[in-house]
Amino acid sequence: MADLRLNYVLLEMKLKPEEDNTKKAATWSYYTRDDVKKFVKKANNYGIDVIPEINSPGHMNVWLENYPEYQLADNSGRKDPNKLDISNPEAVKFYKTLIDEYDGVFTTKYWHMGADEYMIGTSFDNYSKLKTFAEKQYGAGATPNDAFTGFINDIDKYVKAKGKQLRIWNDGIVNTKNVSLNKDIVIEYWYGAGRKPQELVQDGYTLMNATQALYWS
């Protein structure tokens, strides 16, 4: 990478969780803190910034398989380990604790929360609790997309307090009625779902071209 003058690498990986409210997630393959620190140090020596990603609120099965209490349940009561229940304050706290654990290992000024494909293979219609939560939290007429956007903004506020800038994927960003996505978030445009890039730029958002047509093989 250094020879090609590439200076960023996005690392979606699992750091061994060690906090009391996360350590049951120490399954699958993971890296230790020493492993990651050595990797980050070597990358930094070559001028490469290593950006960690824990995708949320979707794609969370490697973290939530042993935490059913944080999994989102559909209208029939069936829980999905891929989906964090953003209406549950304890589930949100769980994700923030993971951020804290990574923060002590990575030196970058960025945090990537993914935020893509939350409803892949399904729709918000099957999760009426998010509609109820959205209206309670964000007012009359709020939709699950408002709740989703509000969750992203909450994480943005959390990482900003740590001196970091939030990065997300684009496909979950839609026009919302009650909650607007924070403008300081970097949107990595990888897929043609959600709002068009021209609209986002016109509204003052910072975009990075990460289109799958060019970079996903």
Where are these regions (language model features)?
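Substrate-binding cleft of carbohydrate-active enzyme catalytic domains
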Residues: 1-164
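Catalytic-core regions of glycoside hydrolase
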Residues: 116-121, 127-217
